Regions:
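Nucleotide/phosphate-binding catalytic cleft detector across ATP-hydrolyzing
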Residues: 1-17, 21-208, 225-226, 236, ...
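Short, glycine/acidic-enriched loop or turn micro-motifs at the edges of active sites
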Residues: 15, 213-214, 220
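Short glycine/threonine-rich loop-to-helix capping motif typified by GTGT followed
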Residues: 198-200, 330-344
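Conserved structured catalytic cores and adjacent interaction surfaces
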Residues: 207, 219, 224-227, 231, ...
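A general structural motif
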Residues: 300-309
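Hydrophobic, well-ordered secondary-structure elements that form the walls
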Residues: 308, 327, 375
Length: 406
């Protein structure tokens, strides 16, 4: 039996699956994955809850499976969130230093970050993250920790991630209905980036693209910090829908064809090859052209990368990603997907590998579990920052900035 005070759980309620990852944090802060639970997701559409009772059952099944594998009782989770309502932008906060000796204190840092978060969001939205980028002291830029410096004007740049309050609360309430506490909600794209990227990759500049069932989340790092985030309401399920429509087959058969014969690029060896589908559900025998199948997939996946590239170009970030692009999520399993993405994004593209996490290879080696692992990793950083801190405000002051620079 494990020491449950060191147990951290990441819970992803996705469009295609619900996944719970149990991690044990060692004394040196390292995270070891000791449990994994998953169930098919039946009540989520484009990353958002559409049938709460059904989702509740799926979450319960995933939690129970994770508990049994890890031999622990799960009480708290870090909950991943996504959806087209999630938005991100950069903002600057300003705070005058009024102490007699002009020395910048922790309170000054807390106040300037608070000012950066005081933005005019739509009434129905709430801040999910305010991620510190860089501080400025009397105009001096590139300051990572201003505490103890002398100055009269403190500024901070932050990346703000926000979402629709009710949609976020729907997920939180559902989890709490299962007698679980939500330690914190975390943007799925952020979680995935924490699982994959090293500190050096963040400094060089990197793009993480998480292709899920109903959404594609992405995060851009440059100079060690997050500069941009985005969510597309397009994912792997849309590929299956396209196949069902284009090939005139049931959705379940389209999904199977995608997994067994799919490719992001048309395989030259498949040209002219056909598949004869067996009789199913009383439907007549059907012949499928494999080249046509792969071309349908290629067009949809191409669209996803084009939309990401257009957003990066508009944000002026395309030239700052020297470490390249890292793919994860179930959609990253499609053969040839990196080869498809490279000419569109005009940089190197590879399948992401979990970084600085040990444990179950069945979880660590699969791109579809990256987000849930990242949620647990987010929690492990939070735990490390709590150690030795005397009060809640003190515990949370620098957590996000520290996490994102690791």
């Amino acid at each position: 039996m494990f020491d449950e005070s060191n147990i951290i759980v990441g819970l992803e309620i996705g469009t295609s699956k619900v996944c719970a990852v149990v991690g044990e944090q060692s004394a040196d802060g390292a995270l070891n994955v000791i449990g994994l639970g998953q169930s098919r997701s039946r009540g989520v559409r484009k990353g958002e809850i559409a049938d709460a009772p059904m989702v509740e059952e799926d979450v319960r099944n995933a939690i129970v499976e994770a508990e049994q594998m890890a031999d622990v009782e799960i009480r708290n989770v870090y909950l991943g969130v996504t959806g087209a309502h999630i938005r991100g932008f950069n903002n600057r906060g300003v705070h005058p230093v009024v102490s007699a000796d002009r020395e910048i204190s922790d309170d000054d840092v807390q106040d300037v970050v608070k000012n950066a978060k005081a933005i005019n969001l739509p009434n129905e939205n709430t801040v999910v993250h305010a991620i510190r980028q860089h501080f400025f002291v009397d105009g001096q830029d590139g300051v990572t920790n201003p505490v103890g410096m002398l100055g009269s004007r403190l500024e901070v740049d932050v990346h703000v991630v926000h979402g629709h309050t009710n949609r976020l609360q729907n997920a939180i309430r559902l989890v709490k209905g299962l007698q679980l506490e939500v330690d914190e909600i975390v943007f799925n794209g952020l979680a995935s980036s924490l699982a994959l990227l090293s500190g050096e990759q963040k400094e060089l500049g990197a793009l993480v693209i998480d292709i899920g069932g109903g959404t594609t989340d992405y995060v851009v790092y440059s100079d060690g910090v997050i500069k941009h985030t985005g969510v597309l309401a397009v994912g792997g399920d849309h590929v299956s829908n396209d196949l069902a429509y284009g090939l005139k087959v049931p959705l379940s058969r389209a999904e199977k064809l995608k997994l067994e014969h799919g490719s992001a690029l048309v395989d030259e060896a498949m040209k002219g090859r056909t598949l004869t589908l067996t009789n199913e559900l009383g439907l007549p025998l059907k012949t499928i052209n494999v080249e046509h199948l792969q071309r349908i997939m290629s067009l949809r996946l191409e669209e996803i990368f084009q939309l990401v590239e257009q957003d990066l170009a508009q944000a002026g970030l395309s030239d700052y990603l020297r470490a390249g692009v890292f793919l994860c999520g179930g959609g990253a399993r499609v053969p040839q997907i990196a080869k498809l993405a490279e000419p569109i994004l005009q940089m190197s593209v590879s399948l992401g590998q979990t970084n600085s996490v040990s444990g179950l290879k069945s979880a660590l080696d699969q791109p579809e579990f990256v987000t849930a692992i990242g949620l647990a990793r987010f929690g492990s950083f939070k735990n490390r920052k709590r150690e030795g801190k005397s009060s809640f405000p003190e515990r949370i002051k620098k957590t996000i900035g520290t996490i994102l620079r690791r």
